[in-house]
Amino acid sequence: MIDVNNFHYMKIGLASPEKIRSWSFGEVKKPETINYRTLKPEKDGLFCERIFGPTKDWECSCGKYKRVRYKGMVCDRCGVEVTKSKVRRERMGHIELAAPVSHIWYFKGIPSRMGLLLDMSPRALEEVIYFASYVVVDPGPTGLEKKTLLSEAEFRDYYDKYPGQFVAKMGAEGIKDLLEEIDLDEELKLLRDELESATGQRLTRAIKRLEVVESFRNSGNKPSWMILDVLPIIPPEIRPMAQLDGGRFATSDLNDLYRRVINRNNRLKRLLDLGAPGIIVQNEKRMLQEAVDALIDNGRRGRPVTGPGNRPLKSLSHMLKGKQGRFRQNLLGKRVDYSGRSVIAVGPSLKMYQCGLPKEMALELFKPFVMKELVQREIATNIKNAKSKIERMDDEVWDVLEEVIREHPVLLNRAPTLHRLGIQAFEPTLVEGRAIRLHPLVTTAYNADFDGDQMAVHVPLSKEAQAEARMLMLAAQNILNPKDGKPVVTPSQDMVLGNYYLTLERKDAVNTGAIFNNTNEVLKAYANGFVHLHTRIGVHASSFNNPTFTEEQNKKILATSVGKIIFNEIIPDSFAYINEPTQENLERKTPNRNFIDPTTLGEGGLKEYFENEELIEPFNKKFLGNIIAEVFNRFSITDTSMMLDRMKDLGFKFSSKAGITVGVADIVVLPDKQQILDEHEKLVDRITKQFNRGLITEEERYNAVVEIWTDAKDQIQGELMQSLDKTNPIFMMSDSGARGNASNFTQLAGMRGLMAAPSGKIIELPITSSFREGLTVLEYFISTHGARKGLADTALKTADSGYLTRRLVDVAQDVIVREEDCGTDRGLLVSDIKEGTEMIEPFIERIEGRYSKETIRHPETDEIIIRPDELITPEIAKKITDAGIEQMYIRSAFTCNARHGVCEKCYGKNLATGEKVEVGEAVGTIAAQSIGEPGTQLTMRTFHTGGVAGSDITQGLPRIQEIFEARNPKGQAVITEIEGVVEDIKLAKDRQQEIVVKGANETRSYLASGTSRIIVEIGQPVQRGEVLTEGSIEPKNYLSVAGLNATESYLLKEVQK
């Protein structure tokens, strides 16, 4: 037997009958398993000790020989070899079949290998193998062709005419004879000749046959081995039988399947010995064939064999197949050593690169390291002693543990791991309790929250693994999201709220307009309660020593607030002083308007100046993200992660000080809500009257009503937001981006608005109450549809999205950066991606980080901005767009010439690091994960364009699947194949609409269904490939009409939506 742990590769192929017999340790002749009284295996049965080895170590069946000293002896009474019982995992048996049987994989698989080799259809094969027809093996003088099928009656006729002069057989025997006659070399020659002359269907078939014939010839397997004469039986330990508590037995399904084969085989042998009538023998042979089929692949043909409770039995193929099969479950999905899992809790005091490990868990995970260290330090005398010390948890163990885990990173993983940020490395610190502590800023990357989520810990053992974890996977290194290059570690919730509150300004704050010499004075004044965080003050600009201030600015007073001074202490020194949430302040310097010349102040001093000035907006979540991105671009990763930690601490500190909470009193109801509702109610009445008088259709009435109520909700929302106090806690939460949005607030204080029915159609009766007032029973009932659909969708979506990701990774995993430059002369023309007026992805974002394909000059000054094959940095991208250029050719993976994968220049920069991409980077997998990861957030619903109107247009996750599978989309759009002018739009028969396009040389008309919305007008010029109706374009048509580049761009745009 091969050594399980020591082999280089595995070859899978056909086994000859001799090979099967050589594996076997004996023939299984009886279907019995074990004796129910003695509980010993039956002799010659499926668990026989003589064939498969002893059930107890070093002991024969009858008990004559016990002990190791008889190793290798064969007992003369029971015939069992004295050896280890482990051999029952590797010794195989066999069954000598009384009639040849076809192997279902080779006959039923797609394409049927047997069918291709014999040039017979799978249908014909099935008729022969399952004893419905005869096949001619040797035609003799009959004038029949070899491989012709004959029915029972036809066979009789020929047999009467030509007795004993021709051979026709039924069942696998006939097929075996035909397979034995095949001369592979001859067949190969004939097929090669056919390839040269054949066309169409015959050519494809010849190619497929050639593949099979060549494979057989190269592998040295004989075609006739696809028919089994001997059936191997896998070792008994792999199909175990165990006794349950009640004296019953639980057994592997394979035993049942083997039992049926043995029973039928024995019966067939007996019938043959008795010389039974042909028809009975035929029936038995067919049943044997079906039993073997069920054993190899149950359910592949006909109804599956079922066990108790109508459950299909698990055959050999099912053991290997699918997610629960041997490959994906046990070989690719092993459980690993040195790992643990626990609930996560937030660790606000941790540094970016740290995580908290519970003491008990750390001790168990690092046990061997601790034991070695204990022995080295001579705290323990030997390993055994060290082990007992650890188990007792002696005091000295903890000191050693702290030493051991220092600088030894661990990996934290949260399932589902949707992208590479689902596993990151941290340096462990020991914590009390039993929960793993997680740094609050990495929660976004893991998509984790602290409502009971669990995470797994893994310990990298080797020095290489530790180095890799530290260099590549440390959380402090993974600040950018690989899918778009934006920071993924932005503060959230409390941290955002704290920083927002800190940078807020108020008109009525205490001692507004006080002027200070330097920041230390400000902090002292704040500590003593002289000024508030929100107080607007002046500070002498020169005292900041800020390198970005101009000489002019240094002579003036900087108008700022106490909170902003505290906030700016966390920003690196050489950065501009951030006084207002604008890109200008971030990228260049603090704007001049924030500096005041003290000589120009009037009688009331700075206070009077502030009274006439507008308040500056506080810093919200988006702006904090911009600060992080800017710091990351200009400083090192270390500086960025240190600043992130300081921002986090600041946020937590001041959100605690602010004590922002939500109470019922914070929800202020709009006084003139009823008036707005009444106005819109009148509008609805008017529409209903028009409908009753037959002036408008049902569809128009429905759409108008929906529009009226949507407008009512928008109006209420607008007025609510206007009337809200800027320091209202709920407003602060939504404005800062910490939690909630305007719509949530409208539902609390204004009205809930329109709801969707289970079908997705919008119910035209709105919910006019808000949560503050309380819903009526009917309103509550209507709103439960949405909630329930939400839950059902989420469950289905997760599985679909995961499956899509899996298929995408499968396809894209070989796309690796293989070379520096493929030298292509083609490029891709890029510009803004827009849908109507809505911007999906602006031009500047599409070119940044890519390589240019052409020289770009400034249209006015004619200076060269960039040359071909140069990287477009953010600065250059800004120059290009500032120059008014709206499109350009860039290097793209679409046009890359690399034989396998892509090249560095066509790919552009690595978004996860912001550096240029290196050869060997698995960019295909990154792309697949970047599409798959947001998949879970996409909506599942088929969006109805206002219910009745228009046809359904798929959106969200199903649309993404449609694109990648190149299916014909639902709600297909009509496109024009010629360039010209829309001449006419009219009704055609069957309630269809006809659009006539007149070109220079020809006129074409297109039919659209009666419900589609036409988006062109009479007299409008259209280009080739332009869309005439709403909907999604079918990619295959578009390819033939508009060409490759247009189709690539269209698919790209659709995915980005």
Swiss-Prot record:
It comes from the Bacteria. Gene3D superfamilies: 1.10.132.30, 1.10.40.90, 2.40.40.20, 2.40.50.100, RNA polymerase II, clamp domain, RNA polymerase Rpb1, domain 3. Zn(2+) 1 binds at C60, C62, C75, C78. Binds 1 Mg(2+) ion per subunit. Binds 2 Zn(2+) ions per subunit. Its cofactor is Mg(2+); Zn(2+). Zn(2+) 2 binds at C822, C896, C903, C906. GO terms for molecular function: DNA binding; DNA-directed RNA polymerase activity; metal ion binding. The keyword Nucleotidyltransferase applies. Its EC number is 2.7.7.6. The RNAP catalytic core consists of 2 alpha, 1 beta, 1 beta' and 1 omega subunit. When a sigma factor is associated with the core the holoenzyme is formed, which can initiate transcription. This is DNA-directed RNA polymerase subunit beta'. It comes from Staphylococcus aureus.
